[in-house]
């Protein structure tokens, strides 16, 4: 028989652990969304600053920004 059920092997019950009890409050707000834009503008500013940082790093890597007194091999 291809499908066989062994008595007591089902994982239908959940186990309570101390780590789970500590993390449960973090998951209690699941599915709730704050009204309005929230922190979206702050995230946009952070993304823009990160893009500027990456472009500066890229320009330094490509030597398109000349750094006085630093020799690049």
From Swiss-Prot:
Native organism is Morus indica (Mulberry)
List residues modified as Phosphothreonine.
3, 5
Q: Which UniProt keywords apply?
A: Chloroplast, Membrane, Phosphoprotein, Photosynthesis, Photosystem II, Plastid, Thylakoid, Transmembrane, Transmembrane helix
**How does this chain assemble?**
PSII is composed of 1 copy each of membrane proteins PsbA, PsbB, PsbC, PsbD, PsbE, PsbF, PsbH, PsbI, PsbJ, PsbK, PsbL, PsbM, PsbT, PsbX, PsbY, PsbZ, Psb30/Ycf12, at least 3 peripheral proteins of the oxygen-evolving complex and a large number of cofactors. It forms dimeric complexes.
Q: How is it modified after translation?
A: Phosphorylation is a light-dependent reaction catalyzed by a membrane-bound kinase; phosphorylation occurs on Thr residue(s) in the N-terminus of the protein.
For biological process, the GO terms are: photosynthesis; protein stabilization
Q: Does the keyword Transcription apply?
A: no
The similarity comment for this entry is: Belongs to the PsbH family.
Query: Would you say which domain of life the source belongs to?
Result: Eukaryota
Annotated InterPro entries: PSII_PsbH (IPR001056), PSII_PsbH_sf (IPR036863)
GO function terms (MF aspect): phosphate ion binding
Q: Which residues cross the membrane?
A: 41-61
Q: What is this protein's name?
A: Photosystem II reaction center protein H
